[in-house]
């Protein structure tokens, strides 16, 4: 969940036995079992997450990445540990630690403070040529307005 230029919102939903992490960019939803079950043996694109609580911190550990989405050069050996801690009413501290001995000599950690968003999360949608279609879309809307 590295920040990008836009679409950085994250929705965190807690349900019985699960936490769901929904990112606005690409609109990916990661369903995190919280019941202590073992990791699934097969690899998957986003890895296999498992979560637990350490005091007031949500900890999500993901393994079993299939290598289709390499993170900074990592591959199938990637072990990702994410920590979510509420530090104030409007701030969530997000820390992630990346381990992959085939790429790095030691694990490394990043800390990002996430602020509460008062706005809505929008569907991530794009299409080819959208920079050229805006004038046509607006022109069509103005035509309809004039001819009502």
Where are these regions (language model features)?
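PEST-like low-complexity, intrinsically disordered acidic/proline/serine-rich tracts
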Residues: 1-148
